[in-house]
C-alpha cells in the first residue's frame, strides 16, 4: 500500500508542477506559453487544466475569443466535478454564450451543482438566475439537479 501511495505522489507531482507553472505564466501575461503547458494535461483529462483553457478561450487570452470552445472546455471540466467550471457552464447557459439561446433551467442546474461542489460564488449566481425563471422552470431544474447530483456527488 505504501508503494502505491508513493507512486501516486511521484507521478502526480509533475502534473501539479505543470499547472502551477502555467498559472504563473498566465499571471505574467504569457498566455500562449501557458496554453501549451496546459494542453497535455487537459487532453489527458485534468479538470483544472481544462477549466483554465476554458478561461483562456472565454476571455481571449492568448487565443482568439471563442465562446463555443470555451464552453466545451468548461463542460469537460464540469463533468469531472470542478466547481469553478460548473459555475462557468451555468453562466454560459444563463447568457446563451456559445449556443443558440439562453437556457435558464440548465444554468440553475449547473450553479446548484457548483454550490454543492463548494464554489462560494455559486449561491449568488443562483439567486440571480432564479429571478429570471418561472416556477415550472425551477421545477424542471430540480429534476435535473437530482439526476446529476446522484451521479456527480454520490456521497453528498
Placement of each model-derived feature along the sequence:
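Terminal, low-structured helical/coil segments at or just beyond the last alpha-helical repeat
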Residues: 121-156
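Sec-dependent signal peptide recognition
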Residues: 1-7
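N-terminal signal peptide c-region/cleavage motif recognized by signal peptidases
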Residues: 12-14
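Hydrophobic face of amphipathic alpha-helices that form TPR/SEL1-like repeat modules
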Residues: 19-25, 41, 52-59, 88-95, ...
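Short helix-capping/linker turns of helical repeat alpha-solenoids
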Residues: 30, 43-46, 59-61, 66, ...
Amino acid at each position: 500500500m505504501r508503494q502505491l501511495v508513493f507512486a501516486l505522489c511521484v507521478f502526480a507531482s509533475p502534473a501539479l508542477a505543470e499547472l502551477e507553472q502555467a498559472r504563473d505564466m498566465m499571471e505574467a501575461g504569457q498566455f500562449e506559453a501557458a496554453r501549451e503547458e496546459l494542453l497535455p494535461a487537459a487532453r489527458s483529462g485534468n479538470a483544472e487544466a481544462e477549466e483554465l483553457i476554458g478561461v483562456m478561450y472565454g476571455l481571449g487570452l492568448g487565443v482568439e475569443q471563442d465562446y463555443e470552445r470555451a464552453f466545451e472546455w468548461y463542460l469537460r471540466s464540469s463533468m469531472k466535478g470542478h466547481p469553478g467550471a460548473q459555475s462557468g457552464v451555468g453562466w454560459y447557459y444563463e447568457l446563451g454564450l456559445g449556443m443558440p439561446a439562453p437556457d435558464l433551467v440548465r444554468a440553475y442546474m449547473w450553479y446548484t451543482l457548483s454550490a454543492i461542489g463548494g464554489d462560494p460564488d455559486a449561491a449568488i449566481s443562483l439567486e440571480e438566475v432564479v429571478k429570471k425563471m418561472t416556477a415550472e422552470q425551477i421545477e424542471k431544474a430540480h429534476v435535473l439537479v437530482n439526476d446529476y447530483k446522484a451521479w456527480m456527488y454520490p456521497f453528498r
